[in-house]
């Protein structure tokens, strides 16, 4: 259940808090050892998935500390230190954890590089044709069997309510709808929510969210319910919907898929989404590098992580 929920639930706490929060850390000296200890402690006290990952694949953050500390030398260059710290962060297997220097950014990519792409641009182009419609970044077409096809490649830009009304009204003659979010790397959670709410006629419980309240791996606040509410004065889709996903459906798209899975008349087909959960926080290391990581913890409707 934990694995399923971690993949299904996305970063929907960002609906409540936008932007990036910053954590003030204890003072460490600007040396390989000081930067190492600062980074390790930040993750140990603030990253929300350590206990989950210990249960999921045996991650032992204390052992990680011992193993990687052995690789430090007092004379190592900043580049060498960056490599060691990046490899240590990759043990978390989280694409939302990044180390950023003035000229480099670390990122865990195995969550999609090690799996089939499950997306063919040429096939998609054949479905869309040359005369497809577009509005607010959504590409849509009516297929020969009277099925609507909508491709949403990003949630970076906003989707206008009027544009959604226009799209859904035009597609109302169709027998069903295919909503393709493969290769959608995420973006604005408000945009993802705005699209999802057009597929329900009633307020739906989506899941729960809790916050880190202390340095312990299991110190969280009481879970708070998260709901999806439809705009009753807007056009809403009333027929069956299939949502297509792959490993590159990530971040805000992961949240979108989680919302859609809770709705009636919606079926999700495809590979597991890439994940990407929690509220992004940032901390600065003594050498000026910025550590980006996640803090809150999403839970499903049964209160399981």
Predicted regions and their residues:
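Active-site microenvironments of hydrolase-like enzyme catalytic domains
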Residues: 186, 230-237
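Single conserved hydrophobic/aromatic residue that forms the stacking wall/gate
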Residues: 293-304
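Bacterial Sec-dependent N-terminal signal peptides
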Residues: 1-29
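Flexible, low-complexity junctional segments that flank or bridge functional domains
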Residues: 21-211, 219-226, 240, 282-284
